[in-house]
Amino acid sequence: MTNMRKSHPLAKIINESLIDLPAPSNISAWWNFGSLLGICLILQILTGLFLAMHYTADTTTAFSSVTHICRDVNYGWIIRYMHANGASMFFICLFIHVGRGMYYGSYTFSETWNIGILLLFAAMATAFMGYVLPWGQMSFWGATVITNLLSAIPYIGTNLVEWVWGGFSVDKATLTRFFAFHFILPFIISALAAVHLLFLHETGSNNPSGMVSDSDKIPFHPYYTIKDILGLLLLILVLMLLVLFSPDLLGDPDNYTPANPLSTPPHIKPEWYFLFAYAILRSIPNKLGGVLALVLSILILAVIPLLHTSKQRSMMFRPLSQCLFWLLTADLLTLTWIGGQPVEHPFMTMGQLASILYFSILLILMPISGTIENRLLKW
């Protein structure tokens, strides 16, 4: 008689995804972040659900309802801070996951990669709308500034902004719809993640060498379940250190002031994980140009598979491309730092240079280095 996990229709899906899944024998800890993202998503949905039970999506009571969660609800403070810092952990895992895909050439699985880009956009939209919900100063002004970017779209821009706002300014209608979207999007992300995995399991996982590893596969359980549990423990450790010791480290103090449309904060900036894109947006003086650069800074990921010129898939044995990859990493960290600085002399120039470097590495230097490395192979 066959094992139930192999014959039962539902158990069979779980079995083929988590237990008997053939996995390459040499995948490193960088392959841990996919499962960590799944766990982060589950954590965010659960904590978000409990927050939604006490939150009120109304401009007059939103701020005080968040205060009520922290002060009066049993363990409300820990749920709130786990949700806020869980988002930061989510994006740390996301950026590492995308970086690993770029480094080891996982983008050659085009369907998996493109759905991954959709997932990234969905996660960014969810996080942005979640940041608006506490209705603090930075929530209100962040929402005003970012939604206003739509007005840069020629002809339909102004109508589009008012349509998104549900009025002539960010107000009750905006908050209510943002809450509705913030609630539904994580479930859409879950569905997209399932499709992401479906396409991944069609081809099988990539590995550090970038070569086909069909002849050397091992079952996912127990080898990688144990390996993933180590990553999970480290993730929980870092998250709980943040939550219990410095829950506001990655937040903005302005968000502890209730939203006031009559007073603008000195520096309007989004959460830290959007600062790199925000710096690219600010580095272009033209509004429409800035918005295009902002969208392209993420959408550029879709072009990476088309610009792959190397005969080798992975960067493991490509020193030139490795140098460019780590230069890109340093550039993104620089952009993140600049995004949090005021729009003043040295930062503006640095932001423009860092933005040019970002696009140059991905669009020009990476393909050139791949071609040079192909030539070097013939020597």
UniProtKB/Swiss-Prot annotation:
Membrane topology, as annotated: Multi-pass membrane protein
Ranges that cross the membrane: 33-53, 77-98, 113-133, 178-198, 226-246, 288-308, 320-340, 347-367
One Pfam entry name: Cytochrome_B
InterPro entries linked: Cyt_b/b6_C, Cyt_b/b6_C_sf, Cyt_b/b6_N, Cytb/b6-like_sf, Cytochrome_b, Cytochrome_b_C_euk/bac, Cytochrome_b_N_euk/bac, Di-haem_cyt_TM
Keywords (A to Z) from UniProt: Electron transport, Heme, Iron, Membrane, Metal-binding, Mitochondrion, Mitochondrion inner membrane, Respiratory chain, Transmembrane, Transmembrane helix, Transport, Ubiquinone
Source superkingdom: Eukaryota
UniProt subcellular location: Mitochondrion inner membrane
Keyword Mitochondrion: yes
PROSITE patterns noted in UniProt: CYTB_CTER (PS51003), CYTB_NTER (PS51002)
GO CC term (a single one): respiratory chain complex III
MF term (GO), any: ubiquinol-cytochrome-c reductase activity
Function, in words: Component of the ubiquinol-cytochrome c reductase complex (complex III or cytochrome b-c1 complex) that is part of the mitochondrial respiratory chain. The b-c1 complex mediates electron transfer from ubiquinol to cytochrome c. Contributes to the generation of a proton gradient across the mitochondrial membrane that is then used for ATP synthesis.
Complexes and interactors: The cytochrome bc1 complex contains 11 subunits: 3 respiratory subunits (MT-CYB, CYC1 and UQCRFS1), 2 core proteins (UQCRC1 and UQCRC2) and 6 low-molecular weight proteins (UQCRH/QCR6, UQCRB/QCR7, UQCRQ/QCR8, UQCR10/QCR9, UQCR11/QCR10 and a cleavage product of UQCRFS1). This cytochrome bc1 complex then forms a dimer.
Note: Heme 1 (or BL or b562) is low-potential and absorbs at about 562 nm, and heme 2 (or BH or b566) is high-potential and absorbs at about 566 nm.
Family: Belongs to the cytochrome b family.
Protein name listed in UniProt: Cytochrome b
Organism: Civettictis civetta (African civet)
